[in-house]
Amino acid sequence: MLLTLAMKLWETFIRRTFGRYLTDEVLEELLNDSNELRIGGERREVTILISDIRQSTELSEKMDPVSFFRMLNHYFEEMIEIINAWRGNILDFVGDSIVAVFGAPKPNELSARDATACAVAMQRRMKAVNEWNLSQEYPEISMGIGIHTGEAILGNIGSMTRAKYDMIGRDVNLTSRIQGFTKSGQILVSDETLAAAGSLVVENEAGAILVRPKGIQNDVLLHDIVGFGDKLL
């Protein structure tokens, strides 16, 4: 009986912690295979995707709050559907930014490929998002996406009553910096992501760009992605 109670408490904790951002399928897999879940933090190679809407502050000041949040939530719904489809897991919404990880909590050897394909699908979906915006007399919006593959420390932050699954580390910060270099409608990925993403990734013929992100000691080579397979931006 004590074992059954402990298992129920554990399941409740996992559902509270992960249920807000993992798909039902992934959540059930975690509950059925506790070896896939490392509570307390672990280092793992993952691919991190961060997206951000351009000029959102100006939009929020021009639009009434109800309309702005309705527009934002519709955008989130569209993006979440795509991220889930490509086996990504959303860790946070920071304002209008989406922070997603591929390869955690479930390992995924194709995390770089999935994240890059996901980003292309997200940018392609923006046409439909803006068609809906215009039908509601909302302004068109655009976003930039940064992707990097590297090591992060992942685990639960908080307590048994209130916890959040999150990631920290240099490579998480670098992904945010990469996103900051993107222009509207652009996808920039690191050398590490491009090398691991596979041959279906289509890079801009203009070639890579060398940048020095703030807070990063070394120069970083970034690649402008314009498609995945036959799906072009």
Short names for language-model regions:
Residues 1-44, 202:
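Regulatory cytosolic signal-relay segments
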Residues 14, 26, 68, 75, ...:
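Helical mechanochemical/support elements of P-loop NTPase systems and associated helical scaffolds
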Residues 21-24, 122-132, 160, 175, ...:
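Conserved, well-folded catalytic cores of nucleic-acid-processing
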Residues 37-117:
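Catalytic NTP-binding/metal-coordinating core of nucleotidyl cyclase/transferase enzymes
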Residues 72-88, 104-145, 149, 170-179:
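Alpha-helical scaffold within the catalytic cores of cyclic-nucleotide enzymes
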Residues 94-95, 135-146, 187-193:
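Acidic/histidine metal-binding catalytic segments
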Residues 101-111, 145-163, 184-185:
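Catalytic strand-loop-helix junctions within cyclic-nucleotide turnover domains
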Residues 152, 181-233:
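Cytosolic regulatory/linker segments at or just downstream of nucleotide-handling modules
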